[in-house]
Regions:
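Conserved catalytic cysteine-centered active-site region
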Residues: 1-3, 35-78, 87, 101-103, ...
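Conserved active-site "lid/cap" helical segment
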Residues: 1-38, 78, 82, 164-190, ...
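Short acidic/glycine-rich loop or secondary-structure boundary segments that cap or lie
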Residues: 101-102, 154-157, 198-201
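A short beta-alpha structural unit
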Residues: 188-198, 224-231
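Short beta-strand segments
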Residues: 27-30, 66, 91-97, 259-262
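Condensing-enzyme catalytic core mediating Claisen C-C bond formation in acyl metabolism
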Residues: 109-182, 188-189, 265, 271-276
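Alpha-helical metal-binding/catalytic segments enriched in His/Glu/Asp
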Residues: 76, 129-137, 240, 244
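Short coil/turn connectors at secondary-structure junctions
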Residues: 21-25, 59-60, 86-91, 120, ...
Length: 276
């Protein structure tokens, strides 16, 4: 995990533009504690080991966020609080995770969640490290602004027998839209963590049908997991990177983006972005 996360964080350090790293908090997102096969004790030692690898010492406000896929959204919210309330110049949000360990793969196989020649309703496991540098708006062209974040809890999880109504995702998306001061109809497209399982696409469709109140000819959904595999806690910085690259290279569907994320345990999160 150290060697997945460190190169991505190093790129953020290279963009600090004179800011002392000792004044930069690092919010490091990792797998949720109840994930089968998860490495023991990563909350206790991974942050320090990454600092040793990079040869730097981040601000003491740095911490590990052990909340899986939705952890990155919590970290983005936390970074905003640190920047605006703690008056930090910037903050790094990083995520690192792997599904390529025996215990994790065995649990996924038992629940028939891996994509195989005999199971089309599954995903390809992967591993990744990703990081983004967040700061206050500068007004420069090419910026991607976080307008809002919201969170929810879903009772009908992927392993439950309850009927899915996307209550948790609706709650998360509405929270993000309220904070952004926008409606669903104002947004141009979506980038999500759906990984190929039918559950995720169904949840996204249900949430959209329950919130969207205007007719839209199209409302694209991008899913980077198709390219990188299921990468758990690394997905939020990856999605932010995809959105930023698309904005700067002018291939986004439009400037306003809804990003949403889901954990197996029911945690839900959404972020609204806007390119400037």
């Amino acid at each position: 995990l150290i060697h997945l996360a460190a190169p991505a964080i190093r790129e953020c350090l290279a963009a600090l533009d004179g800011v002392d790293v000792a004044h930069v908090p690092l919010l490091l997102c990792v797998a949720e504690p109840n994930r089968p096969g998860r490495f023991d004790g990563i909350e206790d030692h991974l942050l320090g080991e990454i600092q040793d690898e990079l040869g730097v010492q981040f601000h003491r406000s740095s911490k590990v966020v052990a909340r899986g896929r939705t952890g990155g959204a919590l970290a983005v919210k936390g970074a905003a609080d640190l920047i605006y309330r703690g008056r930090f110049p910037v903050c790094i949000v990083a995520g690192v995770d792997t599904y390529l360990v025996a215990g994790t793969l065995a649990a996924l196989e038992r629940n028939q969640r891996l994509l195989t020649s005999e199971n089309s309703n599954g995903f390809i496991p992967g591993e990744a490290g990703a990081a983004v540098l967040l700061g206050p708006p500068t007004g420069k062209s090419g910026e991607l602004q976080v307008l809002g974040a919201g969170f929810g809890k879903e009772a009908a999880t992927i392993l439950s027998e309850e009927p899915l109504r996307a209550e948790g995702m609706v709650q998360a998306i509405k929270g993000a839209l309220t904070e952004a001061g926008l409606s669903m109809g104002d947004l141009d497209f979506r980038i999500t963590d759906v990984n190929g399982e039918q559950y995720g696409f169904k949840e996204a469709a249900l949430a959209l049908s329950r919130i969207l109140r205007v007719r839209k000819e199209e409302f694209d959904i991008w899913h980077p997991v198709e390219c990188v595999g299921e990468v758990g806690a690394a997905i939020v910085p990856i999605v932010l990177g995809v959105a930023l690259a698309g904005h700067r290279k002018d291939y986004l569907v439009g400037p306003k983006v809804l990003c949403h994320f889901a954990n197996d345990d029911g945690d839900r999160a959404a972020i609204v972005l806007q390119g400037k």
